[in-house]
Amino acid sequence: MDIEINPQISLLDQVKIQAQVLVPLLKALRAELGEERANKLVTTALREWYHDTVLRAGALTPGSPKEKWAALTAAGMPRIGADIDIQMLKQAPDAIEFNVTGCRYADCFRAVGEPELGAVLLCEGDDHMAEVGSPEVELTRTQTIMKGGKYCDFRYRMKS
């Protein structure tokens, strides 16, 4: 199933719409199946869908893995807009390092009591994007705001 993305809708607004559907569905599944089974079912399905969607976008993007990663990243940034606060640490040909110190996405999912769902819908996408750039782009991240960290530490290494 192809997913159409409306570039005029901010990513935060899209995520809020998704949450309005997914959170009640997840709660209903928990009531029927139990929390552990429902969480596993939903996170597995969303994780696979998101992974496949990003890899499909990468396959349709021309260029080397690094060029694909750069193109998809550049295309996504306008939709993210000012909904994250970035502290740039290093920007060089072989590395990009920054911290996200504020995240309206994490605020949104904490407000509805579902930060793990937010991590699957958003944070894991960064790993999928890095996979598009592999083996030329490598992401290391040890913490995210969504999972309780003080900031999200993005450390990209670029290889030739």
Roles of regions detected by a PLM:
Residues 1-95, 104-122, 136-151, 158-160:
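N-terminal accessory segment detector
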Residues 131:
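A contiguous catalytic/ligand-binding core that recognizes phosphate-bearing ligands
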Residues 127-128:
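Ligand-binding pocket scaffold of soluble enzyme catalytic domains
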Residues 98:
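A helicase ATPase "motif cassette" and its flanking acidic/Ser/Thr-rich regulatory loops
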Residues 101:
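Short loop/turn segments at strand-loop or loop-helix junctions that form parts
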